[in-house]
Each structure stands twice: as structure tokens, then as C-alpha cells.
Amino acid sequence: MNLDLDTNLIILIIYAALAGAYFLVMPAIVYAYLKTRWYVVSSIERVFMYFLMFLFFPGMLVLSPFLNFRPRKQQIES
């Protein structure tokens, strides 16, 4: 009986860690990656960025009220 409780607790901890990684950790890493590379990427890397946004979209929605990276102002050369 005690072994079942320990096993269930370990499984619960594993699920919580995976959910935390999916909803909080990986989207934060993707946000930081997008912020640093957005203006200098190639077309293939941009497709990879869109894939990451699609993959971690639920976590992006969780973090979006707290992280707001605005675009840089464009320098217009005359």
C-alpha cells in the first residue's frame, strides 16, 4: 500500500515538472530567443521561430500578460 502511494507521488511530481516546463520554462526561453534574434534571422530560422511559437502557444498565453516585448523603433535614413 505504501509503495503505491510513493509511486503515485513520484508520477505526480513528474507530471508537475513537465507541465511547469511546458507552460513556464520553455516559453520564457522562446521569448528570450525571439527577442534577441527577431531582426537578424534568415528565412529558415524564422520558420523555426514560428514552429516554436506554435508548439509552445499555451505557455505563451500564460506568460503574455507579464512579458511584453515591444518592437524597436525603426531608424529612417534620409
From Swiss-Prot:
Superkingdom of origin: Bacteria
Molecular function via GO: oxidoreductase activity, acting on NAD(P)H, quinone or similar compound as acceptor; quinone binding
Pfam family, one: NdhL
InterPro entries xrefs: NADH-quinone_OxRdatse_su_L (IPR019654)
Protein's cellular compartments: Cellular thylakoid membrane
Cellular component GO terms held in the UniProt record: plasma membrane-derived thylakoid membrane
Catalysed transformations (reactions): a plastoquinone + NADH + (n+1) H(+)(in) = a plastoquinol + NAD(+) + n H(+)(out); a plastoquinone + NADPH + (n+1) H(+)(in) = a plastoquinol + NADP(+) + n H(+)(out)
Enzyme Commission number: 7.1.1.-
Topological type in the membrane: Multi-pass membrane protein
Keyword terms, alphabetized: Membrane, NAD, NADP, Plastoquinone, Quinone, Thylakoid, Translocase, Transmembrane, Transmembrane helix, Transport
Residues that span the membrane, as ranges: 10-30, 47-67
Protein function: NDH-1 shuttles electrons from an unknown electron donor, via FMN and iron-sulfur (Fe-S) centers, to quinones in the respiratory and/or the photosynthetic chain. The immediate electron acceptor for the enzyme in this species is believed to be plastoquinone. Couples the redox reaction to proton translocation, and thus conserves the redox energy in a proton gradient. Cyanobacterial NDH-1 also plays a role in inorganic carbon-concentration.
Quaternary data: NDH-1 can be composed of about 15 different subunits; different subcomplexes with different compositions have been identified which probably have different functions.
Family indicated by similarity: Belongs to the complex I NdhL subunit family.
Protein name: NAD(P)H-quinone oxidoreductase subunit L
Gene: ndhL
